[in-house]
């Protein structure tokens, strides 16, 4: 990794992108070319040497990348992503890196504004925490797949228990515990797959007819139509907020 790329990476990831733009415009125009993507990489057990090896691997196979390593994370900024071939190559490189070095990674979507680098890094870090908790067997994740969960995790301190159908959802979970039913998890999986009965049944490892029966009972218990899009979205957000609260406790 060249010295100039290290310097630019430090400026960009330490929030001095505008200063870089104003002070060294020629260098900026030559090296930092939109569109961008950010990737955040970490080890399951902190290992700085492993992170550095992984960063070197990415730099060797993909030229237009800036690498910044801080504490337990390696932050990567991919630049000049103008073709579908580039986008696919980045995904493949990061997936291969995760497997080769046994690391966890989250990759952001494309963006053009340099001011968004820090926010994209934050969102990737959040997505990585959430995704690894939900899918511990996976190593490579995409920020956009966890957008709702990221937003919920940020909103939790401000919303608290003032969530949509808070009492009803809590009672649903309590009934599951008392009667050993799985209505709460069934509802969550159903909403996560966009109210698709067959997909939800598959995720729950139950027959489609069993899923339909459970959903009808859930409708009765909650007293709302969970298939109405506006209601479904609000319930899903409430469930994600409740789960985020449990994880933080």
Where are these regions (language model features)?
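Cytosolic nucleotide-utilizing catalytic cores of signal-transduction proteins
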Residues: 1-249
């Amino acid at each position: 990794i060249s010295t100039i790329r290290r310097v630019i990476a430090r400026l960009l990831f330490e929030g001095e992108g505008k200063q870089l733009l104003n002070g060294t415009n020629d260098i900026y125009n030559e090296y930092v070319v939109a569109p961008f993507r950010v990737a955040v990489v970490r080890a399951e057990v902190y290992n700085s040497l492993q992170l550095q090896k992984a960063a070197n691997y990415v730099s060797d196979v993909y030229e237009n990348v800036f690498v910044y390593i801080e504490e337990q994370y390696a932050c990567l900024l991919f630049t000049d992503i103008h073709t579908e071939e580039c986008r696919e190559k980045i995904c493949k490189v990061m997936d291969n890196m995760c497997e080769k070095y046994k690391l966890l990674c989250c990759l952001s979507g494309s963006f053009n504004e340099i001011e968004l680098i820090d926010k994209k890094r934050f969102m990737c870090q959040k997505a990585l925490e959430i995704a690894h908790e939900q899918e511990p067997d996976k190593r490579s994740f995409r920020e956009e797949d966890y957008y709702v969960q990221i937003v919920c995790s940020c909103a939790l301190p401000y919303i608290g228990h003032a969530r949509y159908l808070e009492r009803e959802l809590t009672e649903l979970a309590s009934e599951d515990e008392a009667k050993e039913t799985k209505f709460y998890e069934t509802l969550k999986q159903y909403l996560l797959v966009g109210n698709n009965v067959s997909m939800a049944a598959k995720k729950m490892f139950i027959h489609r007819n069993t899923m339909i029966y459970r959903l009808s009972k859930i409708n009765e218990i909650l007293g709302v139509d969970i298939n109405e899009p506006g209601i479904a979205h609000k319930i899903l957000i409430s469930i994600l907020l409740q789960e985020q609260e449990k994880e933080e406790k």
